[in-house]
A protein has these predicted regions:
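Sec-dependent N-terminal signal peptides
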Residues: 4-13
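Short, solvent-exposed mixed-charge patches
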Residues: 147-149
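Sec/Tat signal peptide C-region and signal peptidase I cleavage site
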Residues: 15-20
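Conserved anchor residues at repeat-unit boundaries in beta-strand-based tandem repeats, strongest
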Residues: 22-31, 43-54, 66-77, 90-100, ...
């Protein structure tokens, strides 16, 4: 019985130690540079301030998304790049976790939009160039070309 108790006790300690390494911080995740691995295996590597993601960092999700860029109080804010699992990507300005400001979105098929975004939608002056050479240039509203120029 004593051996069984010792075995269970050691198993719990070993499992908890392994689990803690997989779902927690390595480095300084309070006010410095650290790596945090979430229980779903999403990983953040980068700067921290007051236990929030802050400064330059990278988040990698198990489903293939990767964001590399600036964080302010754990939100995507400033310059950053989001790569999608299908190979599409957005490079540009972020505010409050959304594409906001100037940016370039490239679809996996080679189509590309260069211009302004508001709340992750094409909005403002921009140009979409499709892989077949078709060009749509003008004022965009809510993701649609509203006025050609």
């Amino acid at each position: 019985m004593r051996r069984l108790f010792l075995f269970i006790f050691l198993s719990v300690i070993i499992c908890n130690s392994a689990f803690a390494r997989k779902t927690g911080c390595e480095g300084d995740c309070e006010n410095g540079i650290g790596t945090w691995t979430y229980t779903d295996q999403t990983v953040y590597v980068g700067g921290w301030r007051e236990s929030l993601k802050h400064g330059q960092g990278t988040v990698t999700w198990p489903n293939g998304y990767i964001y590399t860029g600036e964080f302010v109080d754990s939100k995507w804010q400033g310059q950053g790049t989001l790569i999608f699992p299908d190979g599409a990507q957005y490079i540009g300005e972020w505010f409050n976790d959304n594409m906001n400001g100037q940016g370039t979105f490239t679809w996996a098929n080679g189509d590309m939009y260069v211009g302004e975004f508001i709340d992750s939608k094409r909005h403002g002056q921009g140009t979409r160039t499709n892989a077949d050479g078709t060009i749509m240039k003008g004022i965009w509203k809510e993701g649609e070309l509203a006025e050609s120029n």
